Amino acid sequence: NTAFVAVNTSESYVKPSGKLVSVNMADGSITGTCDLGGQPDSTAHDAAGSFVVIAIENERDEDAGDGRIGQMPAGWVSMVSVADDLADCATLKTTDVTGLAEIGADDPEPEFVDVNGLNETVVTMQENNEMVVIDANGTVISHFPAGTVDLVRIDTEDERAALDFTGEQMGRLREPDGVQWLDDDHFMIANEGDMDGGSRSVTVFKKDGALVWESNSEFETPIIQSGHYPDKRSDAKGAEPEGMEVATFGDKTYAFILAERASTVSVYDVTDAASPVFKQLLPSGIAPEGVIAIPSRNLFVTANEADLIEDGGVRSHVMVYELQDAPAQYPTLTSEGMDGLTGWGAISGMVADEDGMIYAVNDSFYGYQPT
């Protein structure tokens, strides 16, 4: 009956502050507030609802100096017990995560948190490219670098008028954002990137740091084939996998990964945590930022933050999806099966052959002329 909302009240980057607000979902009233002492980024809770964990990021100012980490104060992870549907502020405790990362050890920036069935919390520290696992007592039980990925068959140039997937990026830092436990031993991360990295991929680790599975550049493949690739982000971080949700529907467990720049949701069957299987690409609203699954109703919901009203476009909104025992309704047009990885967009004309093949031409938006 209670939602726990982390609110950023910082007056500046060097004086971060925030609070955890308890909200009665029946009437929207605020029933309690805890001072967090820093700028929160995300929250999670255990299955029983007995405690809330908060990532206190104390984010860097990207316009200060060289914009890199090393800007105090450092971040940390907080936990607070829940009693009678209220956060008990007197139980608030912090876990120091300084000195763990190889990158910016003195300035950790916890980004996203999730709690497993053993009440262990996994934390992404994005700019630090570090993973941390904390037990229910707030003790760090493991930590390790998120590592790097060798990317091939990607577009690395911002020509704004060409889709050329022949580029490579070797040793690209993962710099994960979203994270979700797949079971009590495995978790998946969405490697958005923020400072030096962004591997355009999703990865599964065991909590002891063992690398189990990596999508590499194949995460972007269905996005490219379905006409969703954001070409203007080619010289940055591509489709940018960011938010994530994992939930069990019947006897299947699915991961839903939001690609902020492509405005898509990639659905993976992660019933076998060590071997995720791509199932479907879904269209989202513009710039999906949040996602929640409602398995009891066979639903999941995305929150899409882009507000394009000044340009005559759509407002920020939510989208609701329902799991059905039926063929996928999307995508309706794909370049899957073509020789080579083929992106497309701005279709101007199409004609169908008798064998079911559609021949199409891009309009002048993709008018790049090779030299």
Predicted regions and their residues:
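Sequence/structural signature of beta-propeller domains
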Residues: N1-T371
